[in-house]
Amino acid sequence: MPEKELDYIRSTDAAGSTEKDGGIYIDAFDKQDNAPPKKGFAKFIDGFRRADAEELGIDPNLSEAEKIAIMTANSPLTRSLKNRHLQMIAIGGSIGTGLFVGSGSSLHTGGPAGLLIAYILIGTMIYCTVMSLGELAVTFPVSGAFVTYNSRFIDPSWGFAMAWNYAMQWLVVLPLELVAAAMTVKYWDAKTNSAAFVVIFYVLIVAINFFGVRGYGEAEFIFSAVKVLAVLGFIILGIVLCAGGGPQGGYIGGKNWYIEGAPFPNGAKGVITVFVNAAFAFAGTELCGLAAAETENPRKSLPKACKQVFWRITLFYVICLTLVGLLVPWNDERLLGSSSADASASPFVISIRNAGIKGLPSVMNVVIMIAVLSVGNSSVYGSSRTLAALAASNQAPKIFGYIDKQGRPLVGIIAQLLVGLLCFLAASDKQGEVFNWLLALSGLSSIFTWGSINVCLIRFRRALAAQGRDTGELVFTSQVGVIGAIWGAFLNTVVLCLQFWIAVWPLHSSPSAEAFFSAYLTVPVVIVFYVGHKLWTKNWQVYICAKDIDIDTGRRELDLDLVKQEVAEEKAYIASLPFYRRVYNAWC
């Protein structure tokens, strides 16, 4: 049965209605623009003008939260991301230096078994989180997505803290990644000043985002395709090398699991350290949910994208890291590289060099450089959309809500690019100290974001039950349900607690204030945002009661009876398919 795409109410009758079913009252959809279309340079200049602010016939009796939900649901952001963009962002978006390089230090710290255990556990948490995000984002494909869900389902102050936490995470990531990209070039050219390459990569990121969400989508499609092909190629090569098929021959098998110290060289504390590192390696997984508001058909595309996460975790992380643990000894000194972008510290590169294969290490360094640029590109997208959502929610200066006629949150993009100029500190003698603190500022941001997404799903389901509704009105539900959301929230809490332990008593070093704040700075920053908002608004309510949560405003599917009928028909259609088709539909 072909899926149908329902849309927002688009009639003047609905706009004038005082009914609150859905809470969306749009007054200007039928407005006609009789002006002749602009061409050439005039069209180019006109594209930077603010998008026409639609007159939203908002019921003045609505609460502030409901008004905000309406505004975020009707953002001028363009819905031009296609299914292929979202699928590739989901499957390859967060494959970066955390896998290609960071897994090296994790192998050295936790050993081959510790590495595998940590990534599998964190992988289950990520899968549950993305499933929770998918259910919410398909139901409420609004500007800012999970950035705004916290204010709706948990508490406005927590939403404020989480939104600014997420915006800051991406704001500081751009200069870090630009410098990291320039450092990858040192693999071939150690003489040229890094600042020269920083300029080149900075201009590239500016050019990509000049083309709006479509530019971001196409760039990520290419970047992710390269990363996926590289990982698949390594898996094939790794199996051949383990079996003794490399140029130097010799069966490797599992011997590196039995060398001195393996498979747990640093015991439980080493595994816990890897546990935290593994969480950082998955950062950016949630971006497919943020892109829901700019996707042509989120009802069809987003569930497929969420299901792809299972394959990314299984294929790209678990299988790859199993091979890494087999091919590279945990005590190889090269694993302790000087930076997160040092290709010589990549276990992928080390395994290729150990096999005596020439040329491929350089190819792998290109992949690492592309992975770094991909994260930098995503940082502009993530921060600008978050700032726009904050402005629409009255939680940031209104200027950040400026969205031009091409659907670009222009002021947010400019703000991110200005912060990106910090990358030129690469020429400073204090660059290491500055970037370490920038990294500390964003270190635990993803943990807070993922934990909050799971709590939002739990609160949403509670609100449905409290208001006499059920999941029969949802076009997509999490495959792991509330139990999965509880597991995801629990594991994120565990990571925060374990990181506190590592921050107070670091592995192989003495406790110090500097070590603590470099590992745990995000937590006091979040507390300051949360308490500050409480003091400013004088709203002392800890959480929104389930019966008071708005579960209608911002929905794309407003005719709930029709939705229930379509969901029932779709389930019946799937049940009639052959077994292999049902399995494929469940996992793909």
From Swiss-Prot:
Alphabetized Gene3D superfamilies for the sequence: Amino acid/polyamine transporter I (1.20.1740.10)
A GO MF label: amino acid transmembrane transporter activity
Subcellular location: Cell membrane
Organism of origin: Candida albicans (strain SC5314 / ATCC MYA-2876) (Yeast)
Pfam annotation, one family: AA_permease
Name the record gives this protein: General amino-acid permease GAP2
Phenotype of the disrupted gene, per the record: Leads to a growth defect on medium containing phenylalanine, valine, leucine, or methionine as sole nitrogen source.
Family as reported in the entry's similarity comment: Belongs to the amino acid-polyamine-organocation (APC) superfamily. YAT (TC 2.A.3.10) family.
Keyword entries, A-Z: Amino-acid transport, Cell membrane, Glycoprotein, Membrane, Transmembrane, Transmembrane helix, Transport
Protein's membrane topology: Multi-pass membrane protein
GO cellular component, one term: plasma membrane
Induction conditions: Expression is under control of the CSY1 amino-acid sensor. Induced during biofilm development. Expression is repressed by nitrogen sources. Expression is repressed by the antifungal agents ketoconazole and flucytosine. Expression is also regulated by NRG1 and TUP1.
Record's function text: Amino-acid permease with broad substrate specificity. GAP2 is the only amino-acid permease with very broad substrate specificity, none of the other GAP permeases is able to transport such a variety of amino acids. GAP2 is also able to transport thialysine, and thus probably also lysine. Functions as a sensor via detection of some amino acids including methionine, leading to a rapid activation of trehalase, a downstream target of PKA.
Stored InterPro entries: AA-permease/SLC12A_dom, Amino_acid_permease_CS, Amino_acid_permease_fungi, APC_YAT
Stretches that traverse the bilayer: 88-108, 113-133, 160-180, 193-213, 221-241, 271-291, 309-329, 366-388, 409-429, 438-458, 482-502, 512-532
